[in-house]
Amino acid sequence: MAGCDDPLGPQPWNETPIEVQLWSIDRTEHIGLPSAFDFFNRQRVAVEDPNSASGWDVVVSDVEGGLAFVPAGAFPDIGTDVGIAVITGVSFDDLLEAPRDADAYITDRAVPLVEGGVYVVRTRRAACATFGFSTFTPRYGKVTVTEIDLEEGSVVFKVVVNPNCNDRSFVSPEDD
């Protein structure tokens, strides 16, 4: 990604949210439909076995009374440090930065989703070239759930992901 290859600083990026729909991985009628999201590359992923691949960050799953994001690290064979932070008291639009406290991120269990809820996802670590050195760092994305359809087993959310290495800001450098 260009933001990680520029030794002079972060690249401008578009902070316009994209809308994403995912279906629960737990329902057989959804086989072949995207149930996971790759925040790093900002794309949906069809995952038939959550232990089979690591090219995604969260998967949608059924939990008692609703749907949830499950971070990749909650599955024993994947072992990533993807984390989900539940944000309270701040709207999606007003959330300007991801939490710094590592303890704010849930890495090992499902995070129930609510319509209007705001979340931050810390992606899996990936190679990032900065100042001629390669490091493995996450990206950060903010999410707000706009629709949950329990009968269909689907969730719709808006997401903004900062493409720059380990940058917690949700404000593009152009807007600073």
Where on the chain are the PLM-derived regions?
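Surface-exposed, beta-sheet-biased, low-hydrophobicity segments with strongly acidic/polar composition
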Residues: 4-176
